[in-house]
UniProtKB/Swiss-Prot annotation:
One of its GO terms (biological process) is mitochondrial electron transport, NADH to ubiquinone. Accessory subunit of the mitochondrial membrane respiratory chain NADH dehydrogenase (Complex I), that is believed not to be involved in catalysis. Complex I functions in the transfer of electrons from NADH to the respiratory chain. The immediate electron acceptor for the enzyme is believed to be ubiquinone. Required for the maintenance of muscle integrity and for cell proliferation in the wing imaginal disc epithelium, possibly by interacting with the chaperone-assisted selective autophagy (CASA) pathway. The keyword Transmembrane applies. Disruption phenotype: RNAi-mediated knockdown in muscle results in defective muscle contraction, sarcomeric defects and loss of muscle integrity. RNAi-mediated knockdown in wing imaginal discs results in reduced wing size. This is NADH dehydrogenase [ubiquinone] 1 alpha subcomplex subunit 3. One of its GO terms (cellular component) is mitochondrial inner membrane.
Length: 77
């Protein structure tokens, strides 16, 4: 009789790495890219990245709008 195949998750990953290493490696890189992109987008919006100096259209803010405090002036340079 042959030895029974191991059915744990680590043995499954080892077997996949031995049989199709390009797919496993590519999947790991894709997953890492998705995680880094998610972190990058979260940081972009957390640090008010959409507050660009030059926009394609005009935006008018009222004086009591909290976003009016973040408006950049060209005189800031």
């Amino acid at each position: 009789m042959s030895a029974s195949a191991a059915r744990g998750s680590t043995s499954l990953l080892k077997r996949a790495w031995n049989e199709i290493p390009d797919i496993v490696g590519g999947s790991a890189l894709a997953l890492a890219g998705i995680v880094m992109a998610t972190i990058g987008v979260a940081n972009y919006y957390a640090k008010d990245g959409d507050n660009r100096r030059y926009k394609l259209g005009y935006v008018v803010y009222r004086h009591d709008d909290p976003r009016a405090l973040k408006v950049r002036n060209d005189e800031d340079d």
